Amino acid sequence: MLVAVVKELKQGEGRVACTPENVRKLTDAGHKVIVEKNAGIGSGFSNDMYEKEGAKIVTHEQAWEADLVIKVKEPHESEYQYFKKNQIIWGFLHLASSKEIVEKMQEVGVTAISGETIIKNGKAELLAPMSAIAGQRSAIMGAYYSEAQHGGQGTLVTGVHENVDIPGSTYVIFGGGVAATNAANVALGLNAKVIIIELNDDRIKYLEDMYAEKDVTVVKSTPENLAEQIKKADVFISTILIPGAKPPKLVTREMVKSMKKGSVLIDIAIDQGGTIETIRPTTISDPVYEEEGVIHYGVPNQPGAVPRTSTMALAQGNIDYILEICDKGLEQAIKDNEALSTGVNIYQGQVTNQGLATSHDLDYKEILNVIE
């Protein structure tokens, strides 16, 4: 199987889907690997480093001729022309956010494996490290955009406690998963107060125990509680994600209107559509806009801003799956590995993820029934 590592075209995206170390694992296993020129530069990996591990450096067009194309994010519109029948595209594809790309993949007969929908032992194994990074960075961005020079309230999130007692900011975090706890931990490290809004009762108990000695309040998620707590936020971070599907718009425009003027609103799951009615995707180079008097931060690829760290994390997580596909062939790998099967969103043009099918009102078939 010919494996290609392509350079990301998304604005501000410095990650690469495969490190030189992982290229060596593939070539040692007898697989041919091609790497697009400068694909790893943003993460600190030169072309020479890949060549030393057995890869061949190629052009963008040549990379897309591969049987298995390894990416970080969804293909850019300009790359749709390279899709070919039975080609496998691997990455954090977030297909629920774009019906256009899904229809193009269906038309050509592409197989799409989305890392964010791979579930192992009930957890989003590959997404978790990226969620952790996005959560931590969101807390930092909330502090940054709280400053007056960026349009914020002009508050120092840490407060001041030398001979005076000026309280720090309040972070309201919607959701209680990996991204949420990582955001909360950074906010606490900044001496901020944290309110977490979570739906699941078992998770609420877990969070209450986890933060028993910290300045954290855990609130049951209801529309009424959300509307009340969001008014307290200096920084509001939504972390709600439904793997493979578009989340509902739970944070309404009226709720945003009720927030403090100059407060900061961040939606970590914007790459899947987001849960905030007033949010729209932005870029790392132009990350914010103001609406209803609130600073909106809608960057869909936050880990791309710290590519060295993010690349190491995602490459460590995905290599075993990629090796299994290359060693066994996709169909046998799917049969042998239940977690991998959950990542197959489209198989040779057929939608095989229920959430994706529902999001775009498309026909769904269970993956094991399709490959038999």
Swiss-Prot record:
For this record, the Gene Ontology CC terms, alphabetical, are: plasma membrane
Q: Note whether NAD occurs among the keywords.
A: yes
> What is any one GO biological process for this UniProt entry?
L-alanine catabolic process
Q: Which GO terms describe its molecular function?
A: alanine dehydrogenase activity
**UniProt: NAD(+) binding residues:** 170-200
Q: Where is the active site?
A: H94
- Pathway involvement of the protein, from the record: Amino-acid degradation; L-alanine degradation via dehydrogenase pathway; NH(3) and pyruvate from L-alanine: step 1/1
InterPro entries (alphabetical): Ala_DH (IPR008141), Ala_DH/PNT_CS2 (IPR008143), AlaDH/PNT_CS1 (IPR008142), AlaDH/PNT_N (IPR007886), AlaDH/PNT_NAD(H)-bd (IPR007698), NAD(P)-bd_dom_sf (IPR036291)
Which CDD domains does the UniProt entry name for this protein? Answer: L-AlaDH
Please state what the protein is called. Answer: Alanine dehydrogenase 1
Q: What is the lineage of its organism?
A: Bacteria, Bacillati, Bacillota, Bacilli, Bacillales
Give the encoding gene's name.
Answer: ald1
